[in-house]
Amino acid sequence: MKKRILFWCHADFTYYFTAYYMSKKYESEFYAIVDTAKKPSDFYKNQNHIKFSQMWFLQEEITKNNKNLDLDYLEKIEQEYELNIWKLALNERYFHNFFNFHKFSKNEILTIEQNCCKLFEKIIKEYKPDLVITREPGLHHLKLFIQMCEKKNIQVIQLKIPIGKKLLIAKSDIAFDKIPPQNSTSNKNLTFDDFQQ
């Protein structure tokens, strides 16, 4: 059976190129959540380099005109996934002090959260990814998705901010997976050129 790999794609295309490379090397089913503005979303809709089995466009999904706020549904999600959705939303910069374009009401925030949860739950339960490849969460909806995946034992790996030509891959956004002992690597007689490489 083919592995199902989901990429959380951003405007910087790092995860798109990672998916492209992996699609050439591995027989897998590829999925994508595209978290970008309109123009980059158009690129994803029109691209033909990667055969994604399914793509979801987050901005379209979370802004659906859903006037039926269901607090019971959100409570069920909080219990099933052991989440505090309101706490995540309170820490979202777009909902509060640093976003001057729109003052979100509590109902608007909860409706957006409900739309996120419905999308994420559908992906987790219907498509059942084996692996999620993403970056460190900078916005609450990615943190929410990661927590929901972890609760259902879906492996999540995060590509950390690159340092030079190296990239750290980890399971957590707050800790390293495994740090080798200091004496396991040799750093004697290194030149400046060695450090640059």
Question: Which positions does each model-derived feature cover?
Answer:
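Conserved nucleotide-sugar donor-interacting segment of glycosyltransferase catalytic cores
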Residues: 118-181
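Histidine-anchored nucleotide/phosphate-binding helix
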Residues: 9-26
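Residues that cap or flank secondary-structure elements
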Residues: 10, 112, 136-137
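Short, well-ordered alpha-helical microsegments
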Residues: 14-17, 40-41, 140-143
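Conserved N-terminal ligand/cofactor-binding loop architecture of enzyme catalytic domains
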Residues: 21, 25-117, 161-197
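Nucleotide-activated donor-dependent transferases that construct or modify glycoconjugates
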Residues: 2-12, 34-36, 133
